[in-house]
A protein has these predicted regions:
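Short His-centered aromatic/hydrophobic patch
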Residues: 75-82, 99
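Aromatic "clamp/platform" in nucleotide-sugar-dependent glycosyltransferases that forms part
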Residues: 230, 249
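A short, well-ordered alpha-helix in the C-terminal region of glycosyltransferases
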Residues: 293, 300, 307-321, 330-333
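A conserved mid-protein helix/loop that constitutes part of the nucleotide-sugar donor-binding site
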Residues: 4-15, 170, 174-193, 207-214, ...
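Conserved acidic donor-binding segment of nucleotide-sugar-dependent glycosyltransferases
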Residues: 269, 284-291, 300-305
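Short hydrophobic beta-strand element within catalytic cores of glycosyltransferases
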Residues: 26, 266-269
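Acidic anion/phosphate-binding donor-loop and adjacent secondary structure
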Residues: 54, 58, 135-139, 144, ...
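N-terminal strand-loop element at the rim of the active site
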Residues: 1-57, 208
Length: 337
């Protein structure tokens, strides 16, 4: 299980669901990290198919024997969306999918639309993580496929506790995978307009990491930027920073933005659907892809203590609205509906 927003969500959600039912997590590939350890300690049974290529359709045949006998089979992310749909004849209970994003590469290919309609139609319920995610999916499919919205959540108390008493430095942090939906490039370019004493930390890995390291080097900024890679102790890295940034091309929700706010740090986020609704009127927004506006926004926080403290307080209050317990209650209602 890789370390991304959906994976971190499950690491908090499944232990709560274990209090109401037996839970098994089936993954395509096993990864040894703290998220998996946390699930195992909570009593969640973790099974890995150990496939070499997650896009191999032969996975369908492997899945059939594993998804029998459950009251609910709940699927997250692509390509599991497809493979479980095609293996759904083996499902004896409810089949549920959670849509996590307002956009993806498949939606740029109109010829895929009939297949997409077929796949989503296999699910008893399609849950979206935000109203914007639901709207985008239904527009793409041309029908009301997703009706239910269950907002993502985090363990707010854990993040607030991890940040308690931690002395932050003049630094910026962004916690995200280096993937097409994320926009670390704009944050790197913004560093040209931010005080030279301010450092930037990227927490996360992914296919576009090397490209971003090359960009930082070409701009002469590599000495001010730390590429941490994947990390388990996300809360610590957030707490050690003065400001958290979530720069995205598109976003279904913005779980990292909530984590930043729960740590009592101001968040500066791209003005894109999904993310905007989570942050607006609490943190600060900037025009997506605009490094100069991002820099001005960060500089305003670092240079104005009153603005900084007011924004941090609003962010902490907003984070309380996204407690993982509410997410668990929402899914339990869907499972039993």
């Amino acid at each position: 299980m890789e370390i991304g927003g959906a994976q971190r969500l499950l690491s908090d959600l499944l232990p709560l669901q274990m209090k109401q039912a037996d839970v098994t997590l089936l993954v395509f590939k096993s990864v040894n990290n703290a998220l998996v350890d946390k699930l195992v300690e909570a009593g969640v049974k973790v099974i890995s198919l150990e496939v070499k290529n997650v896009y191999n359709p032969l996975i369908i045949f492997k899945l059939k024997k594993y998804i029998k006998g459950y009251d609910v089979v709940h699927v997250h992310l692509f390509p599991a969306l497809y493979w479980v749909a095609f293996a759904s004849g083996s499902v004896e209970g409810k089949l549920i999918f959670t849509e996590h994003s307002t956009s993806n590469s498949r939606r740029g290919k109109r010829w895929l639309l009939p297949l997409e309609r077929l796949v989503y139609g296999k699910y008893s319920e399609v849950v979206s993580i935000s109203p914007q995610t639901r709207t985008a999916l239904n527009l793409w499919l041309g029908r009301e496929c997703s009706r239910e919205v269950i907002l993502n959540g985090i363990n707010v108390e854990a993040f607030a506790g991890a940040a308690s008493g931690v002395q932050s430095s003049d630094s910026i942090v962004m916690v995200s995978r280096f993937a097409p939906s994320k926009d670390q490039e704009t944050v790197i370019r913004a560093m040209r307009y931010i005080d030279a004493d301010v450092r930037l930390r990227f927490v996360g890995d992914g296919p576009l990491m090397a490209k971003n390291i090359e960009l930082a080097e070409s701009l002469g900024l590599l000495h001010r930027i730390d590429f941490i890679g994947a990390a388990d102790d996300v809360a610590r890295y957030i707490a050690e920073a003065k400001v958290g940034v979530q720069s995205s091309h598109w976003e279904g929700f913005g779980l990292t933005a909530v984590e930043i706010m729960a740590c009592g740090r101001p968040v500066v986020a791209s003005d894109v659907p999904g993310l905007k609704q989570v942050v607006q009127d609490a943190g600060l927004l900037f025009k997506a892809g605009d490094p100069e506006e991002l820099a001005r926004t960060v500089n305003s926080l670092l240079g104005d203590e009153q603005l900084y403290l007011q924004t941090a307080r609003r962010c902490a209050d907003r984070a309380a609205e996204y407690d993982i317990k509410k997410t668990a209650e929402g899914y339990w209602r869907v499972y039993n509906g």
